[in-house]
A protein has these predicted regions:
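Long, low-complexity Q/N-rich tracts
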Residues: 18-30
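Proline/glycine-rich low-complexity loops and linkers
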Residues: 226, 235-240, 287-321, 325, ...
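N-terminal chloroplast transit peptides
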Residues: 2-16, 31-32, 37-48, 52-131
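N-terminal plastid-targeting presequences
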Residues: 33, 47, 116, 124, ...
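An N-terminal, well-structured beta->alpha segment
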Residues: 134, 138-223, 227, 309-346
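Gly/Ser/Thr-enriched, mixed-charge loops and adjacent short helices
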Residues: 251, 268-405
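N-terminal small/polar loop signature for handling phosphorylated ligands or for N-terminal nucleophile
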Residues: 191, 195, 203-269, 361-423
Length: 669
């Protein structure tokens, strides 16, 4: 190889070329760093937020607007400066958050015009904004969702549960419960649990029903819980009662547990139920957790990916073994103790929810023939019928299964198995008032003279049935937690109250941790059925022959169009009470308020010839709605009562109450 000597001028020329190359590289790198916001909107969000917060603002927002990443958009970076006290800025935090809220379907958009409006409202300057939009990918949406609206999180509270829309697919229902929100709720629950227990480290189990969004929300909750320092356990497919039992079962005893479920609601919904060893959380607890979660969502930086090290420990087999043991002890067969259901044919309709285990892990091991059971496989699309023991189609499907397989008993569960109904060998549906009557028969034999607590819409026939069995009936109010808590209150006061149950099928027994457990109720009925069979006594269906049932019944919902709907509904009820108490007013004929109105106003109506009907007007627990129930013992009785109530509503001119549903009851041919 030959080397040619360079002149001094050549050396300088080569050095100059190297310098030019280096300068070009530096310029390109700097340019790319400056335009990184075009490639990654998340960087802008975080940078501007940090800058604003460093300057003393409550909220900082960065925004990029233009075409899809990788193109050449009109782009601008905004910097928000505080121009008024932070307490005023907090009033507009929600508007700023909405600017960055992402659509949980995977597509989000940021609008500079909205940012300008928010900046104007808060008194903060925006350096420039073009008004065009940028669409970002699902991965970036997740990061951008850290500034989601905290108020939206608080609105997910549904009494003592959390409920929301987790999937798209139903027109008009946008997503309200996404992965980021689930992560925040998981972290908030872990925080709440540590404060509640005083422990620096807690273990939390998470179970789910088969809903399509369940695994996504589970992973996000794990991420949030782990971020708070909690140990997390994946309980897999579970039931709501099983999740509670995991907090009290020796050798398990999680500090808390969560069940991901939305009960019988459509496939796109999901939610959470929370437990400690003291039972399900109450409304104030859920409010606290939602407030904590809202703060986490507004702060941002939430992970939605399940951490490594999650322990998988399915709990359903343990729970099923507990139920088997209860049946063995309850039947106490002298000849078939281990298989007390030998010779019984029992079919289960799980509605493709979590209840299929009951056939495979409870009934079959105890000797029952479960052939004819249906919809046992978990399927979150619920392709066959709504998994709801109150649903007409679900009960009809259960009846067909019992009759076609010639079963002795059928059991219908809801999705998460905290409710159930049964069907006797003749195909008689035993749900609602009939289910309460059957369970009352069972517990009153074990606890003579005891009190049964129900919700407000139970029938007069049920009241007579309980009284005839020697029991006391307290007709309380709607909401299964209200019913259960009333029973707990009575027991604490020394009033024996073994059963607290809603007509929906939510039923709890004091002997079973005051837990609303559909599988436990089914177990009690199975034990009773086997005992009666062994003793050659009348069947469970025959027990209900003395239960008076209404000839007609109806329920309608009247929408209230008023911001303060609870106060408006209260005024309607007060006006109705005044009318009913007006002895000179012929509107309702021979009617009077029922005794012990704990909810709304229940009016007893004399229908003649010794027949008694009633109607109940009450406010919904959560919605801007008034609910009107009718029950009659005569043909056409509901129509007559509805017409009188409808005429009264017209006369009173309640302009913000949509009474069209009650008018339809008597105007329909």
């Amino acid at each position: 190889m030959r080397f040619f000597p360079l002149s001094l001028a050549g050396v300088f020329l080569l050095a100059a070329r190297v310098v030019v190359v280096v300068v070009v590289v530096v310029v390109v790198v700097v340019a790319r760093r400056r335009t990184r916001c075009v490639d990654d909107p998340v960087v802008i969000v975080r940078r501007a937020t940090r800058e604003a917060m460093d300057a003393g603002a409550d909220v900082g927002v960065g925004i990029v607007v233009g075409a899809e990443c990788g193109a050449h958009p009109r782009q601008t970076t905004t910097r928000i400066r505080p121009a008024q006290p932070s307490h005023e800025a907090r009033e507009h935090r929600r508007n700023a958050a909405r600017v960055m809220r992402a659509n949980a379907s995977g597509v989000g958009a940021v609008d500079a015009r909205a940012l300008r409006a928010t900046a104007s409202a808060t008194g903060r300057r925006v350096s420039s904004a073009s008004g065009s939009r940028i669409t970002v990918s699902r991965r970036r949406v997740r990061a951008m969702a850290t500034t989601a609206d905290g108020e939206r999180v608080k609105k997910l509270q549904n009494g003592s549960d959390i409920r929301g829309v987790a999937l798209e697919g139903v027109e008009g229902e946008g997503i309200t419960l996404d992965a980021t929100t689930a992560s925040a709720i998981g972290r908030a629950f872990a925080d709440w649990l540590m404060v509640k227990t005083g422990a620096r480290e807690v273990t939390i189990g998470v179970g789910r029903d088969p809903r399509l969004s369940g695994e996504m929300l589970r992973d996000a909750m794990f991420a949030g819980m782990a971020a708070s320092g909690a140990k997390v356990v994946d309980m897999g497919l579970a039931t709501t009662p099983a999740c509670f039992m995991a907090t009290v079962t020796p050798g398990v005893e999680y500090a808390g547990s969560v069940m991901l479920t939305a009960s019988h609601l459509p496939f796109n919904r999901n939610g959470m139920k929370f437990f400690t060893s003291a039972g399900g959380l109450d409304k104030p607890d859920i409010k606290d957790i939602c407030a904590r979660a809202a703060a986490y969502v507004e702060a941002g930086g939430l992970s939605v990916n399940a951490p490594s090290g999650v322990v998988r420990a399915p709990f359903l087999p343990t729970y099923a073994a507990q139920l088997c043991d209860i049946i063995r002890k309850g039947v106490n067969s002298p000849t078939h103790y281990d298989k007390p259901l030998s010779g019984m044919k029992i079919v289960v309709d799980a509605g493709n929810g979590s209840g299929g285990f009951f056939a495979d892990l409870v009934l079959a091991p105890l000797g029952a023939d479960t052939n004819g059971s249906q919809f046992l496989n978990p399927d979150g699309s619920f392709p066959n019928h709504s998994p709801n023991p109150e649903d007409k189609e679900a009960m009809e499907a259960g009846v067909r299964a019992v009759l076609s397989s010639k079963a002795d008993l059928g059991i219908v569960f809801d999705t998460d198995v905290d409710r159930s109904a049964v069907i006797d060998a003749s195909g008689k549906e035993i749900n609602r008032n009939k289910l309460i009557a059957l369970l009352s028969e069972i517990v009153l034999k074990e606890n003579p003279g005891a009190t049964i607590v129900t919700d407000s819409v139970t029938s007069d026939g049920l009241h007579k049935f309980i009284k005839a069995k020697g029991g006391h009936h307290l007709r309380f109010m709607r909401g299964y937690k209200n019913v259960i808590n009333k029973g707990k209150e009575l027991n604490a006061a020394g009033v024996v109250t073994p059963l607290m149950i809603e007509t929906s099928g939510h039923g709890a027994m004091s002997e079973n941790y005051d837990l609303d457990d559909g599988a436990y109720l089914a177990v009690k009925i199975i034990i009773e059925a086997v005992r009666r069979r062994i003793a050659n006594e009348p069947s469970i269906g025959q027990v209900l022959e003395t239960l008076e049932e209404p000839l007609e019944e109806a329920e309608v919902r009247l929408k209230i169009v008023d911001p303060d709907f609870k106060a408006y509904g209260g005024n309607v009820i007060e006006s109705l009470l005044e009318t009913v108490n007006d002895t000179d007013h012929p509107l309702f004929g021979k009617s009077s308020p029922a005794e012990d109105n704990y909810e709304g106003l229940r009016v007893c109506v004399d229908e003649g010839d010794g027949n008694k009907g009633w109607f109940l007007l009450r406010c919904s627990l959560h919605d801007p709605v008034m609910v009107l129930n009718f029950e009659s013992q005569v043909s056409g009785g509901v129509k007559i009562m509805a017409e009188e109530v409808g005429a009264w509503l017209i006369d009173q001119n309640f302009s913000k109450l949509d009474a069209s549903a009650v008018h339809a009851l008597y105007r329909t041919p």
